[in-house]
Amino acid sequence: MSSYENHQALDGLTLGKSTDYRDNYDASLLQGVPRSLNRDPLGLTADNLPFHGADIWTLYELSWLNSQGLPQVAVGHVELDYTSVNLIESKSFKLYLNSFNQTRFDTWETVRQTLERDLRACAQGNVSVRLHRLDELEGQPVAHFHGTCIDDQDISIDNYQFTTDYLQHAVSGEKQVEETLVSHLLKSNCLITHQPDWGSIQIQYRGRKIDREKLLRYLVSFRHHNEFHEQCVERIFNDILRFCQPETLSVYARYTRRGGLDINPWRSNTDFVPATGRLARQ
């Protein structure tokens, strides 16, 4: 259980509550969650963040009416900057997108600008939005995370409670290595509803070699942990940086979609360009 799971800042969220679906545009449906909720316990403040990054959202269920009433569909790509005051709560995002369904917009650009304006207001930070026609995306191959998968280890696990203990003394040798490690076994739970969130994670670092068994045990320990996607990625970044002390570090997770949305947060302290192709489970 997260230390802030019952924080009053979460009281007003529609997440976990019965809600009506509106199909006429309503920006008030968007709800933000302060990033400080998970950053404060980690000792992170806006002026001492050890990373940069973004939350990348893919919007698969986006539709509206053109000026003549003909339905339009698109796939949206949203990038929410890590410096925003709030992250966007996903159920409210879904409800907000549904409100476009029976609303007329003159142009695609008007839709894009509307999304960008509303998301920036909710997040209190920088947001960029791109809209793609379906024929732009047809035929795109399923992508994969570059790196060495650490999942196929012959180990026994019987503890699924989150702990950083596995990262203590998890590095060895004095030689600097540079490697990219991948796991598809990341599973955490929604902070509010405790529904499972499934993801794949890519960890790039340069530093003393990290023990792969200990790293995998640490990642598996999220299995009963309740936090939002973005919060988990920041926790993983912070824990690896704290205990393993790599010179450079990038952590990137791509989660399976829910409600027509997938969330793909990344954090890095070096030059890092995230590949945005959808993975096999997305």
From Swiss-Prot:
Substrate binds at I88, E89, S90, H229, E230. The active site is at C190 (thioimide intermediate), D197 (proton donor). NCBIfam families: QueF (TIGR03138). This is NADPH-dependent 7-cyano-7-deazaguanine reductase. It comes from the Bacteria. GO terms for molecular function: preQ1 synthase activity. The keyword Cytoplasm applies. Its EC number is 1.7.1.13. Signal peptide: none annotated. GO terms for cellular component: cytoplasm. Pathway: tRNA modification; tRNA-queuosine biosynthesis. Catalyzes the NADPH-dependent reduction of 7-cyano-7-deazaguanine (preQ0) to 7-aminomethyl-7-deazaguanine (preQ1). It is an enzyme of class 1 (oxidoreductase). Homodimer. Belongs to the GTP cyclohydrolase I family. QueF type 2 subfamily. PANTHER family: NADPH-DEPENDENT 7-CYANO-7-DEAZAGUANINE REDUCTASE. InterPro entries: GTP-CH-I_C/QueF, NADPH_dep_7-cyano-7-deazaG_red, QueF, QueF_N, QueF_type2. It is found in: Cytoplasm. It catalyses: 7-aminomethyl-7-carbaguanine + 2 NADP(+) = 7-cyano-7-deazaguanine + 2 NADPH + 3 H(+). Keywords: Cytoplasm, NADP, Oxidoreductase, Queuosine biosynthesis. GO terms for biological process: queuosine biosynthetic process; tRNA modification.
